[in-house]
């Protein structure tokens, strides 16, 4: 796809020289056709729909031309943040969360404040499977039918979209091109799953052991409901542990402040409800702990996907408890392999099936080219050349870890 100059400038600023597989596949059809995009969490679905839509924006026309619907405020704030970065290179581009503005692109929740504009030609539903749940399906159908009056092109994106949900979309929008880059809906190649055997001890003892084991990492702790979250945060506070919690009962300003702090790497332990399991980018977090299992099975995949983003490895922990066995059996049948971890009496963790060597990081073609360039510079053998070469390559990997990989949005 050929991008207009402002988008080329943005891509250059963010050092994006290649696109992920879902982006390349979607670029071939969107926004000329209605599309469904399915790919792993952290694979770059946001840019897959956002860049082509922005490529069609006419900034001389001060009217809404594209809209992105999202299921949570956190995801809305995240996309608006990305768009504000793009605006620095895209002179004249206006974005908003309100339909009563003259912004070119609107990012919004589904609700009563939707205003139909005949100039809107591109409509996206991110994390569309959430809109297809029983509690919100009727509202989603009404929204789709409202915009169909002016025949825009639709985009539907998610990490988990099953056949039944796909058929629901087909009933409303046709023709439809499906781009499926995720052949195994229940598995993520960069997530390691662990089942913690408590050996008769309390779950909170297991949680403390995990927090101690990962004391140098940022940790997300998921709770399935408000009661569970309240009980856990009370235990953490009683034990004088430092943490933040994010859930639907907070005010929008409170939620935004905590979310921003977590995204900016100033929160080590974040206790959250499942509202944060969808589409959110928290690049500094590498560990997920499910204090309890989600009510909707597929939400477990979205939970674990919070820490396997930007080609980074992530660890996801579940407690081996009697009331979890039914769901764990279903997860196993879906192909999720859990490594066994044991909580010792002294509070340490034993990983009998886990090799302690670090996983090799995924290497992009851009990084491979840079490594080849370093090696090519040492054609003549000089004293300590291997040591200097190794140090330069190590610095490359360190820089990659520090810099956010924008292409995976």
Swiss-Prot record:
Pfam families: DEAD (PF00270), Helicase_C (PF00271). It comes from the Bacteria. Keywords: ATP-binding, Helicase, Hydrolase, Nucleotide-binding, RNA-binding. It catalyses: ATP + H2O = ADP + phosphate + H(+). Residues 190-349 form the Helicase C-terminal domain. InterPro entries: DEAD/DEAH_box_helicase_dom (IPR011545), Helicase_ATP-bd (IPR014001), Helicase_C-like (IPR001650), P-loop_NTPase (IPR027417). Its EC number is 3.6.4.13. ATP binds at residues 39-46. SUPFAM superfamilies: P-loop containing nucleoside triphosphate hydrolases. One of its GO terms (molecular function) is ATP hydrolysis activity. SMART domains: DEXDc (SM00487), HELICc (SM00490). A motif (DEVD box) lies at residues 126-129. Residues 26-179 form the Helicase ATP-binding domain. The keyword Chaperone does not apply. Belongs to the DEAD box helicase family. PANTHER family: RNA HELICASE. This is Probable ATP-dependent RNA helicase MG308 homolog.
């Amino acid at each position: 796809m050929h991008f207009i100059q402002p988008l080329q400038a943005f891509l250059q600023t963010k050092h994006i020289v290649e696109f992920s597989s879902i982006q390349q596949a979607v670029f071939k059809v969107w926004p000329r056709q209605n599309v469904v995009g399915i790919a792993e969490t952290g694979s770059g679905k946001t840019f897959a729909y956002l860049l082509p839509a922005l490529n069609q924006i006419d900034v001389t026309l001060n009217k809404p031309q594209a809209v992105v619907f999202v299921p949570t405020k956190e995801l809305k704030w995240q996309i608006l943040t990305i768009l504000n970065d793009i605006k620095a290179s895209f002179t004249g581009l206006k974005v908003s969360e309100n339909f009563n503005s003259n912004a070119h692109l609107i990012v919004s929740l589904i609700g009563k404040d939707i205003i139909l504009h005949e100039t809107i030609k591109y409509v996206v539903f991110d994390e569309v499977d959430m809109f297809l749940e029983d509690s919100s399906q009727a509202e989603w159908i009404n929204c789709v039918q409202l915009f169909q009056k002016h025949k825009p092109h639709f985009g539907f994106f998610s990490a988990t979209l099953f056949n039944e949900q796909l058929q629901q979309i087909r009933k409303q929008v046709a023709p439809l091109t499906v781009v499926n880059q995720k052949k195994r809906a229940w598995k993520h190649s960069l997530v390691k799953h662990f089942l913690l055997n408590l050996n008769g001890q309390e779950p909170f003892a297991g949680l403390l052991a995990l927090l101690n084991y990962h004391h140098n990492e940022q940790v997300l702790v998921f709770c399935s409901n408000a009661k569970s979250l309240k009980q856990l945060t009370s235990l953490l506070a009683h034990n004088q542990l430092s943490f933040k919690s994010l859930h639907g009962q907070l005010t929008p300003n409170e939620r935004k402040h905590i979310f921003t702090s977590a995204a900016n790497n100033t929160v080590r332990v974040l206790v959250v409800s499942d509202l944060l399991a969808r589409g959110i980018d928290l690049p500094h977090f590498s560990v997920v702990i499910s204090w309890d299992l989600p009510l909707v099975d597929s939400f477990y995949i979205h939970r674990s996907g919070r820490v396997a983003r930007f080609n980074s490895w992530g660890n996801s922990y579940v407690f081996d408890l009697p009331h979890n066995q039914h769901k764990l059996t279903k997860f196993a049948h879906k192909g999720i392999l859990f490594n066994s971890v044991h909580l010792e009496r002294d509070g340490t963790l034993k990983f009998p099936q886990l090799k302690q060597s670090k996983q090799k990081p995924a290497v992009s073609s851009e990084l491979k080219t840079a490594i080849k360039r370093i090696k090519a510079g040492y054609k003549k053998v000089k004293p300590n050349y291997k040591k200097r070469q190794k140090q330069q390559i190590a610095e490359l990997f360190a820089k990659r870890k520090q810099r956010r990989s924008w292409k995976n949005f």
